[in-house]
């Protein structure tokens, strides 16, 4: 009698649930996965090599394009590595602004995750809800940097500029008349901090809406509970970080365990899962959204009370103000040297890691004393998680592979780099 061979199926790279350009070669016994082999590299853009040909400051926009859903957090790790090499002190106001925008970015990421994860599993409404909130947060990005996504707002020594006192206003168009525009601009009459505060007051009710739609939903639980289970020991052995590790019951968060910037002054909790399955990771991320909202509120209160500089006064690292540059020859020279030659970073090496929405995102920078990095290594959290896909998917159905890819929160910009 002939042997029955396993069936090989190509999943992706142009599959709607593949989260970008994932190609999975699945070995199937009927509908059960025997082996899942991820093929990566389809979004490789040689970021680490490109950084070696650019000055230290010119590489900041490349960081936005790594995990293109969590833009400012990527920048944060990079500028922290430069600051460690330079031994720079960042003004306290800039630290609070960075922490606030890190958490806004965490919300952006988790909303994208919950929307696309639910859409993959078959719940479309949450996707539309999540993008309604993301629109407000893109406006926050736009107010400080001029860009909705790729902000390039963090700079070595601080941030590009202080928070604006006014918000961009909508104008009447063919789509929206004067009456509609008046309603849309209601929350935009004050400063950016007023706009963010208004959003943080509304946001908990939005999270309640997502939970109403999903948390006790029978179909959602059937698709997530006991799928992709990872034990705490295995999660550590495979190098998991972030919600993937906390979902397995290990309380590890760089914001608490190795605090950077002003996280040690913040009051927040670390949500931890119990079962290590997709449902536990879902609950962890939903609670993380609530905790991020708490941190943003604390930052708003502090920033209202404490004006001050937002970037270092050292003009060999940060450009002088435009007013000074146009009236003072020395400042003009500083400006010219900074944007032509860049910063000469002392020889040495530094590793800076941040608690990225997906896990531990690290930048290992080596300087040989020149104005460009000698070597830049990017530690992407998603790379480790994708490597565990085979183990997590084995023995499950094809439909469950989609759920597992969703729970890993994979973005290929950072994996392929």
Swiss-Prot record:
Keywords: Cell inner membrane, Cell membrane, Membrane, NAD, Quinone, Translocase, Transport, Ubiquinone. It comes from the Bacteria. It is an enzyme of class 7 (translocase). Its EC number is 7.1.1.-. Transmembrane segments: none annotated. The keyword Transferase does not apply. One of its GO terms (molecular function) is NADH:ubiquinone reductase (non-electrogenic) activity. GO terms for cellular component: plasma membrane. It is found in: Cell inner membrane. InterPro entries: NADH_Q_OxRdtase_suD, NADH_UbQ_OxRdtase_49kDa_CS, NDH1_su_D/H, NiFe-Hase_large. Its main location: membrane. It is a peripheral membrane protein. PROSITE patterns: COMPLEX1_49K. Pfam families: Complex1_49kDa (PF00346). It catalyses: a quinone + NADH + 5 H(+)(in) = a quinol + NAD(+) + 4 H(+)(out). NDH-1 shuttles electrons from NADH, via FMN and iron-sulfur (Fe-S) centers, to quinones in the respiratory chain. The immediate electron acceptor for the enzyme in this species is believed to be ubiquinone. Couples the redox reaction to proton translocation (for every two electrons transferred, four hydrogen ions are translocated across the cytoplasmic membrane), and thus conserves the redox energy in a proton gradient. Belongs to the complex I 49 kDa subunit family. HAMAP family: NDH1_NuoD (MF_01358). NDH-1 is composed of 14 different subunits. Subunits NuoB, C, D, E, F, and G constitute the peripheral sector of the complex. This is NADH-quinone oxidoreductase subunit D. It comes from Cupriavidus metallidurans (strain ATCC 43123 / DSM 2839 / NBRC 102507 / CH34).
């Amino acid at each position: 009698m002939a042997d029955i061979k396993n069936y090989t199926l190509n999943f992706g790279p142009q599959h709607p649930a593949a989260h970008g350009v994932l190609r999975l070669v699945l070995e199937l016994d009927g509908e059960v996965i025997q082996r899942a082999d991820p093929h990566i590299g389809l979004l490789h853009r040689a970021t680490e090599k490109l950084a070696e040909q650019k000055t230290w400051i010119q590489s900041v926009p490349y960081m936005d394009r790594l995990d293109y859903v969590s833009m400012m957090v990527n920048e944060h790790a990079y500028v922290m590595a430069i600051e460690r090499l330079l031994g720079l002190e960042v003004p306290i106001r800039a630290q609070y602004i960075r922490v606030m925008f890190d958490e806004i970015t965490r919300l952006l990421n988790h909303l994208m995750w919950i929307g696309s994860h639910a859409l993959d599993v078959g719940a479309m409404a949450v996707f539309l809800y999540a993008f309604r909130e993301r629109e407000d947060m893109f406006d926050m990005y736009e107010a400080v940097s001029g860009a909705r996504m790729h902000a390039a707002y963090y700079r070595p020594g601080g941030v590009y500029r202080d928070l604006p006192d006014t918000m961009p206003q909508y104008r009447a168009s063919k789509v929206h008349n004067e009456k509609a525009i008046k309603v849309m601009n209601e929350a935009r009459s004050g400063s950016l901090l007023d706009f963010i505060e208004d959003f943080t007051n509304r946001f908990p009710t939005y999270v309640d809406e997502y939970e109403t739609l999903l948390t006790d939903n029978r179909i959602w639980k059937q698709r997530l509970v006991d799928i992709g289970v990872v034990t705490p020991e295995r999660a550590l052995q495979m190098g998991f970080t972030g919600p993937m590790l906390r979902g397995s019951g290990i309380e590890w968060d760089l914001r608490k365990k190795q605090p950077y910037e002003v996280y040690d002054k913040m009051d927040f909790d670390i949500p931890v899962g119990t079962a290590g399955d997709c449902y536990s990771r879902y609950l962890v991320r939903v609670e993380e959204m609530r905790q991020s909202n708490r941190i943003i509120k604390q930052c708003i209160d502090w920033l209202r009370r404490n004006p001050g500089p937002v970037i270092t006064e050292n003009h060999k690292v940060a450009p002088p103000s435009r007013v000074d540059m146009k009236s003072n020859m020395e400042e003009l020279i500083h400006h010219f040297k900074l944007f032509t030659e860049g910063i000469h970073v002392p020889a040495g090496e530094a590793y800076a890691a941040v608690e990225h929405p997906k896990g531990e995102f690290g930048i290992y920078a080596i300087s040989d004393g020149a104005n460009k990095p000698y070597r830049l290594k990017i530690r992407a959290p998603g790379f480790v998680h994708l490597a565990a896909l085979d183990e997590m998917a084995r023995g499950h159905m094809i439909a469950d592979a989609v759920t597992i890819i969703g729970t890993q929160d994979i973005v290929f910009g950072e994996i392929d780099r």
